[in-house]
A protein has these predicted regions:
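PRY/SPRY (B30.2) beta-sandwich protein-interaction domains
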Residues: 1-239
Length: 239
């Protein structure tokens, strides 16, 4: 401060995380303003890490929604107290009372391995646990959703199979709210931490270990992005 008032900045500590996020291409994050987490969970690392507190039946959704196109993101199960009640997926009706209890809520449960929609639980895929990376591919052009564990598409899924929907978890309805959003939820008093990678190349502050093949829109993921899919970003939404 050259004014003589000594309003000087102090050099701070810490480590900077280099990301692709910029004004020209903003990446999705999780949304702490979501109506149904009720302030119970904590968010860090640019709202990409979600610490699920012990409150029951809560979920949060992402900041960007979609009604068409093909989208891919990853989320790492960092730690848990119980995988039984945690699930990943998408949601349209974000004012619902619990995850996947409506016709427009779709989830993949870790233990036991189940898919969940409209309160119906069906055995599907393999179990996942702490340390696993779950990939989500949503094909809104054909109304299909696919899930992978550590790069392996469950039920021999093929996100590029179009209307055939080979190995898809669900044929999803058109979003009643106009959009679907990425979601993480749980249904009982268990705790857990999830870190999302919407294409910035990090889970929390840890960079992906071996970046896969990206889509046409800039993004860095642990595993290959299925052909024709894009990261959930402002540039991707406007292509």
């Amino acid at each position: 401060d050259q004014s003589g008032n000594s309003n000087n900045f102090t050099v701070g500590g810490g480590t900077l995380t280099n990301t692709l996020d910029c004004p020209d291409n903003v990446f999705a994050t999780m949304n702490p303003l979501t109506s149904y987490y009720a302030g119970a969970w904590t968010f860090s690392n640019g709202n990409n890490t979600v610490n699920m507190a012990t409150t029951s039946e809560r979920y949060v959704v992402g900041t960007m929604g979609f009604s068409s196109g093909k989208w891919y993101w990853e989320q790492k199960y960092v730690s848990k107290s119980d995988s039984t009640f945690s699930r990943v997926g998408i949601e349209s009706n974000i004012n619902n009372t619990a995850p996947d209890q409506s016709t427009s809520g779709y989830g993949y449960r870790g233990q036991p391995a189940q898919k969940v929609n409209n309160g119906t639980y069906t055995s599907w895929g393999n179990t996942y646990t702490a340390g696993d990376i779950i990939g989500v591919a949503v094909d809104m052009d054909n109304n299909k959703i696919y899930f992978s564990i550590n790069g392996v598409w469950q039920e021999s899924g093929d996100p590029t199979s179009g209307a055939t929907g080979t190995g898809s978890a669900f044929t999803i309805i058109d979003p009643p709210s106009g959009f679907y959003f990425p979601k993480i939820g749980k249904e009982a008093a268990a705790t857990g931490v999830w870190s999302f990678n919407f294409g910035n190349g990090y889970f929390g502050t840890t960079a992906v270990s071996s970046a896969g093949t990206p889509g046409s829109t800039p993004g860095v993921f642990e595993y290959d992005v299925p052909s024709g899919y894009e990261p959930l970003t402002t540039k991707g939404l406007n292509t």
